[in-house]
Regions:
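Conserved redox-cofactor binding core of oxidoreductases
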Residues: 44-63, 69, 181-262, 267, ...
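N-terminal Rossmann-like FAD-binding beta1-loop-alpha1 element of flavoenzymes
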Residues: 92-117
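Glycine-rich FAD pyrophosphate-binding loop
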Residues: 109-132, 141
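Glycine-rich phosphate/pyrophosphate-binding loops
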Residues: 114-121, 278-287, 297-299, 303-321
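Glycine-rich active-site loop/strand segments that organize a redox cofactor
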Residues: 137-168
Length: 375
């Protein structure tokens, strides 16, 4: 299965295993991390970025792949669709059938709204399904949302929007409770206590997992809840443009049935964009574990109507994935393997970094090892 070159490396890794057992690589200083990121992290490659020429983020920079999408013209011509002919009329239109979209639809339905999900693939075909390691929430006695906030704020180099990060950490325990009550089978002790583990850059064990298929289990539960509630789901139908009313408020979307090629009109009092990110656009040519649907569709829809993008100049490069064999190139290797003891080693069998550094530092360390150090 392995190439001769790989087998040589495997032998070196095996030969150094005994010396690594029980050792803990030192953590980098803040200065070392900053220098490492500047030299090796993809977000610092000036040649990979272009200036945005139009829209609310005009004058700012983003990865070239995203900028080209932001500069693109709509595929919709006025003679393609009759806006007076309404095909769907609902209170809430949710665009996107992943974890966020399903959750939004469930909550809207619980509040009594007439809600519909539209997704360009199938419900559940999303990055939520691809997640393996777990979801973090400070719900143990030795932890708190304040500590979670500090870990996350520092791990993000103090660039996070405080109000958004506060909402994340304060509501995370309730989100875990909600998912648990819906039926998500989190890992638990015999007495029912949830098992938690460390994640990269965390000072407390707050990672809640479902074995190594956390996202699939969460999506299974959400999908079942959507079906059990009878929430309509229009699959293989993409939103190609948002519609505004005479008050300039979003009032629905033009949809494209990807099987028939027909354009459809959905009218809604509220539109929720839950289409995920841009990870499948292969920024800077990197392989990706992102789902095929993560192609920035919703970002472009919102941007064309004046919604500014946040953090458009950065993207998370997950440190660990499959490089061989080619059939699963780019598949995710979850952070959880490092949280329970796995080390990152180079081709010489040397542990070159602490296994629980933050993801940006870990990714930059791996890139340095493979390029500058040639290991």
């Amino acid at each position: 299965m392995f190439t001769p070159e790989m087998m040589e490396s495997v032998k070196k890794v095996e030969a150094t295993r005994a010396s690594r057992l029980g050792m803990e690589p030192r953590r980098m200083t803040a200065e070392e991390k900053d220098q490492l990121l500047r030299e090796f992290h993809p977000d610092y490659r000036a040649e990979a970025f272009e200036e945005i020429k139009v829209g609310p983020n005009k004058g700012q920079k983003a990865n070239k792949e995203l900028v080209h999408m932001l500069h693109s013209n709509s595929r919709l011509l006025k003679d393609h669709v009759d806006l007076s002919k309404i095909d769907y009329d609902v209170d809430v239109l949710v665009i996107g059938g992943g974890g966020a979209g399903a959750s939004a639809a469930i909550e809207a339905h619980e509040a009594g709204a007439d809600v519909m999900i539209v997704t360009k693939l199938r419900i559940g075909d999303a990055n939520t399904m691809m997640a393996e390691g777990g979801i973090q929430a400070a719900d143990k006695e030795n932890d708190s949302p304040v500590q979670h906030y500090l870990d996350a704020f520092g791990g993000g180099h103090f660039a996070a929007r405080p109000e958004l990060l506060k909402k994340l950490v304060m509501e995370a325990p309730d989100a875990i409770k909600w998912l648990n009550e819906l039926g998500v089978m989190f890992d638990k002790d015999a007495d029912g206590t949830m098992i938690t583990t460390h994640g990269g850059g965390t000072s407390r064990k707050r990672m809640h997992a479902c074995k190594d298929y956390s996202g699939a289990e969460i999506m299974r539960t959400l999908r079942d809840e959507v079906i059990n509630r009878g929430i309509p789901v229009v699959e293989f139908t993409s939103a190609v443009e948002l519609i505004r009313d005479e008050k300039n408020q979003v009032a629905g979307a033009v949809l494209l049935n990807m099987e028939t090629g027909d354009y459809l009109v959905a009218r809604a009092k509220t539109v929720i964009i839950a289409t995920g990110g841009a990870g499948r656009m292969h920024y800077q040519g990197f392989a990706t574990s992102n789902h095929y649907g993560a192609t920035a569709d919703g970002l472009i829809l919102g941007y064309r109507l004046g919604a500014p993008l946040l953090y458009q100049d950065t993207i998370q490069y997950h440190p660990t994935g499959v490089a061989y064999p080619a059939q699963i190139f780019g598949a995710l290797v979850t952070e959880k393997v490092r949280s329970i003891g796995a080390m990152l080693v180079n081709s010489e069998g040397e542990a070159f970094m602490h296994p629980l550094e933050t993801r940006d530092v870990s990714a930059a360390s791996i890139i340095r090892e493979c390029t500058a150090r040639g290991k």
